[in-house]
From Swiss-Prot:
Functional note: Produces ATP from ADP in the presence of a proton gradient across the membrane.
Signal sequence region: none
A GO term for molecular function: proton-transporting ATP synthase activity, rotational mechanism
Source superkingdom: Bacteria
Gene Ontology biological process: proton motive force-driven plasma membrane ATP synthesis
Xref: NCBIfam families: PRK00373.1-5, V_ATPase_subD
Keyword field: ATP synthesis, Hydrogen ion transport, Ion transport, Transport
A Pfam cross-reference name: ATP-synt_D
Name of this chain's protein: V-type ATP synthase subunit D
Family statement drawn from the similarity comment of this UniProt entry: Belongs to the V-ATPase D subunit family.
Length: 207
């Protein structure tokens, strides 16, 4: 604890008591914020882990299927299949406020740039094989999960940063500001009591 460098007057005492009251209230609010952020962070980490396992498992399976399907096609045909984008993805990113942390919310709108009549693929079914078609379709279906995974991971990063900032502020109030204010208030109260006793002694001597 460090006593603040202030004059031991009643005015300073009142000011310090007001500052202490504000600091205590701020400490409670910050602790509540930290605890709620921790709760949200843990929930997001759990969801992230589950979704990441799901996505990674699906990607491994789709990659294996793609390798098998690719073996049935010529390299030129595979290049032609992926030369033209199958779908057009418009990504709109908004933000959501979680305990003063602005986390991303992603919304994807997927269009077939060649019109609904063209279907989901823009290459010839005859030129491809069913395994390739199914693999490409399955990979496309992963897009919402991939976007959600990116959204969660960015949110976790932002919340972790804010939790650390809030933790430092809580500790600063708990272990420095509040103890220093209490120590200074105690010191001023002692000084004022001493002054009152000295004044009383002088008055008694005069009488």
């Amino acid at each position: 604890m460090t006593r603040l460098n202030v004059k031991p007057t009643r005015m300073e005492l009142n000011n310090l008591k007001a500052r202490l009251k504000t600091a205590v209230r701020g400490h409670k609010l910050l602790k509540d914020k930290r605890d709620e952020l921790m709760r949200r962070f843990i929930e997001s980490v759990r969801e992230n882990n589950q979704l990441r396992q799901k996505v990674e498992s699906a990607l491994v399976g789709h990659l294996q299927d793609f390798v098998m399907a690719k073996a049935l096609e010529s390299d030129l045909m595979v290049e032609e299949i992926f030369a033209v984008p199958m779908r057009e993805v418009n990504l709109h990113v908004e933000t959501e406020n979680i305990m003063s942390v602005r986390v991303p919310k992603m919304h994807a709108h997927i269009d077939n740039p060649y019109g609904d009549d063209e279907g989901d693929v823009v290459y010839s079914y005859v030129a491809s094989n069913s395994q390739m078609d199914e693999t490409i379709e399955s990979m496309s279906d992963l897009l919402p999960d991939l976007l959600r995974l990116a959204e969660i991971e960015k949110s976790c990063q932002l919340m972790a940063d804010e939790i650390e900032k809030t933790r430092r502020r809580v500790n600063g109030l708990e272990y420095a500001t509040i103890p220093d204010l209490k120590e200074t208030i105690y010191y001023i109260e002692m000084k004022l009591e001493e002054a009152e006793r000295a004044s009383l002694v002088r008055m008694m001597k005069v009488k």
